[in-house]
Amino acid sequence: MAAPIMLCDTAGMSNDRWLECRMHGPKGDIPYTVGGSDVAAIFGVSPWTTPLELWLIKKGRMKPPKKMNADQLAMGHMLEPIAAEWYARKSGNHVYQDTGLYQHADHPYALANFDRKYIRASDGDDG
């Protein structure tokens, strides 16, 4: 399997620009994208979005609903560095922030932002 393609660095990017990149890629040339946050909706287990709603949003036939879980999102962002530090201490792995927006090599609609990556202490390999 080919390595993911880094499309751009999102460090310092405005939230609106980041959302544009997530929706259509940094050049705006991807008709629709699927990210990690969409997977729960695709499988029908999201408490916020149904598969039909997601399809309508991706096709531009429905506006995304306002974030009903804004407090949970904010808390998650606040706790990310703490969780990363805890994992690093427990595992011995080196954890670092990654601000890239990546595209799957075989499926150009599949995009991802990795909040953190790690280097395994056992062999120095990326994880």
Q: Language-model segments: what does each one mean?
A:
Residues 59-61, 85, 99-101:
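Short glycine-rich, polar/acidic loop-and-turn segments at beta strand-coil junctions
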Residues 1-82:
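Charged, glycine-rich intrinsically disordered N-terminal tails and low-complexity linkers that flank
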Residues 83, 113-115:
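Short, hydrophobic/aromatic alpha-helical segments in well-folded domains
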Residues 75-77, 100, 112:
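Glycine-centered structural positions embedded in regular secondary structure
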Residues 76-94:
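Signature of the catalytic double-stranded beta-helix
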Residues 117-127:
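Active-site beta-strand-loop-beta-strand hairpin of nuclease catalytic cores
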Residues 88-108, 115-117:
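A short acidic/basic microdomain associated with nuclease active sites
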